[in-house]
Curated annotation (Swiss-Prot):
InterPro entries: Ribosomal_uL16, Ribosomal_uL16_bact-type, Ribosomal_uL16_CS, Ribosomal_uL16_dom, Ribosomal_uL16_sf
Chain's role: Binds 23S rRNA and is also seen to make contacts with the A and possibly P site tRNAs.
Organism: Renibacterium salmoninarum (strain ATCC 33209 / DSM 20767 / JCM 11484 / NBRC 15589 / NCIMB 2235)
UniProt keyword terms in alphabetical order: Ribonucleoprotein, Ribosomal protein, RNA-binding, rRNA-binding, tRNA-binding
Location of region: Disordered: 1-25
Transcription regulation among keywords: no
Segments of skewed composition (Basic residues): 1-16
GO cellular component: cytosolic large ribosomal subunit
Subunit structure: Part of the 50S ribosomal subunit.
GO biological process: translation
Alphabetical list of PROSITE patterns matching this protein: RIBOSOMAL_L16_1, RIBOSOMAL_L16_2
Protein name: Large ribosomal subunit protein uL16
Stored CDD domains: Ribosomal_L16_L10e (cd01433)
Length: 138
């Protein structure tokens, strides 16, 4: 599971979800990738679940890159607690994903296997996404 080793502040404000991604919008490591079409908070559990779905489908071949990291804590107050008395305790770690961001990349397998593996991973994520291919003749 992806969790930061240490953070400067234990509790943070919720990150904004508006706007387009400015960096990480192209497939740079692998041959195929998953590109977000809608904004979302992706938790560390969802990232891990998508990674497992991909690696199980491609079996031993291929390599997977994870291009997002859950570096923001999301807090929650306990159930049946009255309002007030401060902010809740950190419950999850999230990555703030904006439209256009490439989340995962994959290489080393044929196109049919790669598309199916990425399709399985998209179903584990809380956003709409598409499968993109690397640009250029490499």
């Amino acid at each position: 599971m992806l969790i930061p080793r240490r953070v400067k502040h234990r509790k943070q404000h919720h990150p904004g979800r508006s706007g387009q991604a400015t960096g990480g919008t192209k497939v740079s490591f692998g041959e195929y990738g998953i590109q977000a079409l809608t904004p979302a908070y992706v938790t560390n559990r969802q990232i891990e679940s998508a990674r497992i779905a991909m690696t199980r489908h491609i079996k031993r071949g291929g390599k997977v890159w994870i291009n997002i990291y859950p570096d923001r804590p999301l807090t929650k107050k306990p159930a049946e607690t009255r309002m007030g008395s401060g902010k809740g305790s950190p419950e999850w770690w999230i990555a703030n994903v904006k439209p256009g961001r490439v989340l995962f990349e994959l290489s080393g397998v044929n196109e049919e296997v790669a598309r199916e593996a990425l399709r399985l991973a998209i179903h584990k994520l809380p956003l709409k996404a598409r499968i993109v291919r690397r640009e250029g003749g490499e």
